[in-house]
């Protein structure tokens, strides 16, 4: 079972002659292609004329070819096969094209021209009439030799549908047509069509009723199942609606083609060429016995021919281009897929060995640790607190690149002890064994609990600018100023202590606490002053070599007000030498 659409508009050429309008031809081509894609197996190109017919109205409708359809829709064969499978239509069913003429009848003269002897009507496959008044409608139902009566239900009807006339037309084998494109218009038109067409549906009860599109554009063309659903608005059941676009159409086409090809609808008439001979003694060929009652003889398209034509157009494209072999690409991929190490690489990334800094308990930063130190002050107050910043990496002196130092430094443990005395407070820092200073331990029983801190310093040689700390990090001017003030205050305190020792003749019992180079060193005074021999032993133990001071990286010069001053270590050395004398 196949579905038909027997009303595809055809824009007629001008009366003076000529070819089809370019825009109309493109529209007809698109409509035919869309109908074929939706699963229809036959269409009729409808031409409408008004007035008196003439010889110029003979059929000149060119049927569409495979090449023209493929240009519009290259994948037409696959789409047609898909929709035909859904509709249950065999793929071997050819796509057929028919020609149709619709005559608008108003006068009696026009009605008289609708006869079987008119050569203009014989040139078309299907003859339809559209009555414009009551007389034309009655004549078409009773006497006109036509195949189809098409009624315009969009406007107010100029005649009444009489049941006897409708019944007479059905008995004569004439079919009535309803266009569903009128239902897809505005609400007013839809209401008018439904009210007028419902009467015709009730009287015919689906018998000799044909549903066609009459679509002026591609967007108004619907598939067979959609048309069946639309017919519920007119009161048609699904079976009768399906018959209106399939069975009834096929019966009407078979009838009109039989009347056109057979004499008295019994004897087949075929034209022979001048070179062909016919003999009654010879049996008829098999081609003559094979007759398709639905074929008009022209414009039939097989789906296989359509597929072959499509393949032929793509032969050159297949030769010039090579398809991607996705199977080989997928086989080359690892089963577990790509991992991060496959993309980044398996080589280990060399981490720069930099000086490690362990944060103190006071600060939460991972790179900077602050060491607070206090100088000797009054009984209950600390004189001054300074902050020394330390970082993870040391930057080389090369201007073009920065390289972290690769020397692994030994961890140095400093024990900060808060010593209390009758005259002042101080901080004791125990330095590492590699430094040139040896520090004495605090002998006070009132010493506070130890606070452990781990830092690392560099051992590489290199000159440092006066404005940098011993780790090579630039210091702010405020820090430099604080360091300079601390150095001067320390020198003053040492001079005062030496004078007191000279006048009293007693040596101080205080222990000297010296931090790493660049830090403060404080002397805590006590009541008892040791003997000069004890001071000599302390100086020998400290082993301060002033001559080798320039060769150590730990010694840093402190600048104050753009003037160079002696280092703290040199001043301590001189002070201790005077004290020994």
Curated annotation (Swiss-Prot):
This molecule's function is given as: Probable component of ribonuclease P, a ribonucleoprotein complex that generates mature tRNA molecules by cleaving their 5'-ends. May also be a component of the MRP ribonuclease complex, which cleaves pre-rRNA sequences. Required for female gametophyte development and male competence.
MF terms in GO: hydrolase activity
Q: Which superkingdom? A: Eukaryota
Q: What is its EC number?
A: 3.1.26.-
GO terms for biological process, alphabetical: rRNA processing; tRNA processing
Instruction: Note whether tRNA processing occurs among the keywords.
Output: yes
Q: Where is the composition biased (Basic and acidic residues)?
A: 496-512
Please note every region of biased composition (Polar residues): 452-467
Q: Which UniProt keywords apply?
A: Hydrolase, Mitochondrion, Nucleus, rRNA processing, tRNA processing
Provide the leader sequence positions: none
UniProt xrefs under InterPro entries = Pol/histidinol_Pase-like, RNase_P_p30
Q: In which tissues is it expressed?
A: Mostly expressed in inflorescence and roots, to a lower extent in leaves, and, at low levels, in siliques, seedlings and stems.
Q: Which family does it belong to?
A: Belongs to the eukaryotic/archaeal RNase P protein component 3 family.
Please give the GO cellular component terms listed in this UniProt entry. Answer: mitochondrion; nucleolus; nucleus
- Which Pfam families does the annotation name? RNase_P_p30
Localized where? Nucleus, Nucleolus; Nucleus; Mitochondrion
Q: What happens when the gene is disrupted?
A: Impaired progression of the gametophytic division during female gametogenesis leading to arrested embryo sacs at stages ranging from FG1 to FG7. Normal pollen development, but weaker pollen tube fitness associated with a reduced transmission through the male gametes.
What is the protein named?
A: Protein GAMETOPHYTE DEFECTIVE 1
Give the quaternary structure: Probable component of nuclear RNase P and RNase MRP ribonucleoproteins. Interacts with POP5.
Enzyme class per UniProt: hydrolase
Q: Where is this region: Disordered?
A: 452-512
